[in-house]
């Protein structure tokens, strides 16, 4: 490679969007290999990687080894590298992890892209011999990235927001179920006390309380609203306090805050899901440099 990868003045997509969003576009190529690079972008970075891998292949070829053939399957979900006959997936490069893609104008067969490895988080440069269709493959990867980015912004953000609301409502429901169980236990305790209370009736129909220090249930009156000092009745029983109007508005009849689905807080994502969303957002935000042209659309929506 005697000079830099040339820069395209514009982008002309090669395929119908449905071919990449609902299916994939296959290409056959020879896989020269992959090597670690220090930077996620740069013509000089990929030029050095191509030289290194070409030299390594020349040595292996002199030893009688053939360059392995692979099948590339490009879609909005990534670039898969498969063994042509068995269809075994050798590498699966997600688009938001691909930061640079280029084809060599001095050699129509060679194209390369840089992808961040999902396990090591190192930047790897993949190099292919594509039988004179390097430019088409480069454009196809660029188109797939463009479509995937749009899909992430248009539908991904809404889906994320919906899942947040559902998670918040599920958490609120769990809290309400816990409160409800506690209230049921309190009611059961009241019923048990009622059964053991000794109540005597007079001929006039009045009720005589066996203990002047308790109410008709032989216990201190229960109030789910508040616990101010009780008021004494004429017969010495302790009467429950009357709740204020403001408390009645803020609490339901069980003393719990009324459930409002519009005001419930958004729940947190599990760490693995949240980290995946953050990773995708960061990858798409970086954009894909395609032969020096950055395919980075509008700024990321704050909802994502």
Curated annotation (Swiss-Prot):
GO cellular component term of the entry, any: cytoplasm
Record-annotated PID domain positions: 21-176
InterPro entries, per database record: Adapter_Engulfment-Domain (IPR051133), PH-like_dom_sf (IPR011993), PTB/PI_dom (IPR006020)
Domain of life: Eukaryota
PROSITE patterns: PID
UniProt-listed Gene3D superfamilies: Pleckstrin-homology domain (PH domain)/Phosphotyrosine-binding domain (PTB)
GO terms of biological process kind: apoptotic process; lipid transport; phagocytosis, engulfment
Presence of the UniProt keyword Cytoplasm in the record: yes
Keyword Coiled coil recorded: yes
Record SUPFAM superfamilies: PH domain-like
Positions carrying Phosphoserine: 223
Pfam family, one: PID
Entries under SMART domains matching the protein: PTB (SM00462)
CDD domains: PTB_CED-6 (cd01273)
Location of this chain's protein in the cell: Cytoplasm
Residues forming coiled coils: 159-202
Keyword entries, A-Z: Apoptosis, Coiled coil, Cytoplasm, Lipid transport, Phagocytosis, Phosphoprotein, Transport
Tissues and organs where the protein is expressed, per its UniProt entry: Detected throughout adult and fetal brain. Detected in cerebellum, cortex and hippocampus (at protein level).
Family in the record: Belongs to the ced-6 family.
Role this protein plays: May function as an adapter protein. Required for efficient phagocytosis of apoptotic cells. Modulates cellular glycosphingolipid and cholesterol transport. May play a role in the internalization and endosomal trafficking of various LRP1 ligands, such as PSAP. Increases cellular levels of GTP-bound ARF6.
Subunit note: Homodimer. Interacts with GDP-bound ARF6, but not with GTP-bound ARF6. Part of a complex composed of GULP1, ACAP1 and ARF6. Interacts with ACAP1, LRP1, MEGF10 and STAB2. Interacts with clathrin.
Protein name per its UniProtKB record: PTB domain-containing engulfment adapter protein 1
UniProt organism field: Rattus norvegicus
Gene for this chain: Gulp1
């Amino acid at each position: 490679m005697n000079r830099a990868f040339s820069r395209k003045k514009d982008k002309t997509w090669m395929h119908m969007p449905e071919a990449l969003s609902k299916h994939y576009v296959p290409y056959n190529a020879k896989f020269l290999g992959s090597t670690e690079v220090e930077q996620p972008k740069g013509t000089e970075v990929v030029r050095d990687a191509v030289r290194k891998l070409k030299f390594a292949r020349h040595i292996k070829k002199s030893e009688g080894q053939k360059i392995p053939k692979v099948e590339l399957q490009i879609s909005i979900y990534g670039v898969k590298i498969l063994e042509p006959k068995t269809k075994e997936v050798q590498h699966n490069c997600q688009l938001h992890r691909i930061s640079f893609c280029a084809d060599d104008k001095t050699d129509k067969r060679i194209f390369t892209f840089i992808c961040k490895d999902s396990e090591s988080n190192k930047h790897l440069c993949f190099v292919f011999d594509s039988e004179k269709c390097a430019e088409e493959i480069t454009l196809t990867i660029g188109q797939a990235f463009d479509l995937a980015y749009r899909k992430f912004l248009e539908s991904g953000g809404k889906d994320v927001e919906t899942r947040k609301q559902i998670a918040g409502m599920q958490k609120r429901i769990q809290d309400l179920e816990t409160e409800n169980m506690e209230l049921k236990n309190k009611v059961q305790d009241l019923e048990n006390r009622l059964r053991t209370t000794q109540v005597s009736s007079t001929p006039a129909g009045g009720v005589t309380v066996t203990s002047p220090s308790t109410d008709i249930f032989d216990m201190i009156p229960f109030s789910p609203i508040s616990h101010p000092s009780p008021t004494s009745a004429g017969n010495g029983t302790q009467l429950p306090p009357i709740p204020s109007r403001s408390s009645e508005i803020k609490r339901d009849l069980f003393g719990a805050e009324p459930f409002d689905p519009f005001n419930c807080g958004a729940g947190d994502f599990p760490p693995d899901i949240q980290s995946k969303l953050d990773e995708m957002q960061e990858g798409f935000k970086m954009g894909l440099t395609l032969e020096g042209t950055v395919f980075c659309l509008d700024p990321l929506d704050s909802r994502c």
